[in-house]
């Protein structure tokens, strides 16, 4: 408090506390839904985002055989530990008490088997992204691995292959027997060659395949999509820091201001969904720009008919927009969002054509430039050539009418 200017007065406000818990299913309908969910997760290939139940059953059938290749899983202790990396970390054992105190009740309540019987003929099963959220499901997968089974993890959205560092995914998903990507084939580990390389399998994902070239303009609206703004960093990755997210939010203001009143009148803003401990989003934007309307309801159908899409971050929506052929402009501060070398090269090509900008104001200037006919600019030969390169690297689409054959062939070979 002593560092404040003399004219300032500091007042300590009331403590703000949010508690988010996963309620136990109550009632017959909820219990039935929970049971069906557990049965779905028990499939060799559970239903994943963007995939149908029919595909999950077909892909599960393709994984019924014993594994046909040597196990390519990487040991965390053997590849990522301080000993494996040649580091000396003298952390006192007393520090473990801190970790124990923060251990979630969902994990603390688990009971682990003392012994696991090995599989006679190890098989591969695909892991749902729920392995990050469901402690019991995660334990089930750990038992599978403990018995010698192999895991296939599957990319479920953006950032994979694009962020320079994505430590949780690197250690949890990339270390498994195989990882199905949306097109990319390599990742430069933060720990270098000593940590090894993942078994990356580029496959056309159904979530993107269904949207292939599906954009048809039906409105005069530009949709401006934002992302989560956490005030506490909850994993080590190449996202902005909490302080940088404050500037990220300020950039939204400069972007909307630079659009001018005519474009703002046609602008819809799409905030990220509510997450505990994040900055105010729409509550901060809309009062500053009353002309801007809130984009509500399912996002997919709206962007498939919009006049122009603008993104202030890279993520799943960018990949879907490229697959669907939506006229899209992007901006973000590259020092806030460090990217992989492959994505960085592609951003250079996108910047040369005005598809991506390093500042909010320059992006707004491009919006005004193409506003009369965004589709004419988007469908120009140079822009479409870069779009095709983007799709080949980060949003792979099937060669034929269906993506199923590529998946079935791959799964049968594992």
Description of each model-found segment:
Residues 1-414:
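Catalytic-core helical/loop segments in enzymes performing group transfer/polymerization on anionic/lipid-linked
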């Amino acid at each position: 408090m002593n560092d404040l200017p003399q004219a300032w007065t500091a007042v300590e406000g009331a403590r703000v506390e949010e508690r988010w818990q996963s309620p136990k299913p109550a009632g017959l309908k909820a219990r039935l839904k929970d049971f069906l969910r557990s049965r779905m997760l028990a499939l060799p290939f559970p239903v994943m985002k963007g995939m149908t139940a029919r595909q999950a059953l077909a892909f599960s059938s393709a994984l019924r055989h014993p594994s046909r290749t040597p196990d390519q899983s990487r040991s965390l202790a053997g590849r990522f530990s301080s000993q494996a990396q040649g580091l000396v970390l003298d952390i006192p054992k007393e520090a473990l008490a801190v970790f124990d105190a923060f251990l979630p009740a969902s994990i603390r309540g688990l009971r682990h088997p003392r012994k696991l019987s090995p599989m006679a003929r190890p098989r591969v099963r695909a892991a749902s992204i729920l392995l990050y959220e469901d402690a019991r499901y995660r334990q089930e997968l750990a038992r599978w691995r403990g018995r010698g089974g192999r895991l296939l993890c599957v990319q479920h959205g953006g950032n994979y292959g694009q962020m320079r560092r994505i430590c949780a995914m690197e250690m949890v998903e990339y270390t498994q027997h195989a990882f199905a990507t949306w097109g990319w084939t390599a990742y430069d580990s933060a720990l270098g060659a000593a940590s090894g390389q993942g078994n990356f399998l580029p496959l056309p994902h159904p979530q993107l395949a269904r949207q292939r070239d599906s954009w048809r303009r039906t409105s005069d609206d530009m949709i401006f999509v934002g992302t989560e703004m956490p005030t506490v960093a909850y994993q080590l990755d190449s996202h902005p820091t909490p302080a940088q997210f404050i500037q990220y939010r300020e950039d939204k203001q400069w972007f909307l201001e630079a659009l001018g009143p005519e474009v703002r009148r046609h602008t819809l803003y799409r905030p990220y969904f509510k997450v505990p401990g994040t900055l105010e989003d729409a509550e901060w934007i809309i009062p500053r720009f009353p002309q801007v309307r809130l984009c509500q309801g399912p996002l997919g159908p709206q962007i498939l008919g919009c006049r122009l899409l603008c993104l202030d971050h890279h993520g799943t929506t960018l990949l879907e927009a490229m697959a669907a052929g939506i006229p899209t402009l992007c901006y973000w501060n590259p020092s806030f969002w460090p990217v992989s070398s492959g994505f960085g090269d592609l951003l250079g090509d996108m910047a040369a054509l005005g598809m991506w900008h390093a500042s909010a104001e320059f992006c707004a200037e491009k919006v005004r430039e193409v506003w009369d006919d965004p589709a004419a600019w988007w469908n120009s030969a140079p822009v479409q050539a870069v779009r095709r390169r983007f799709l080949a690297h980060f949003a792979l689409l099937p060669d034929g009418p269906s993506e199923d054959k590529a998946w079935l062939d791959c799964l049968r070979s594992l």
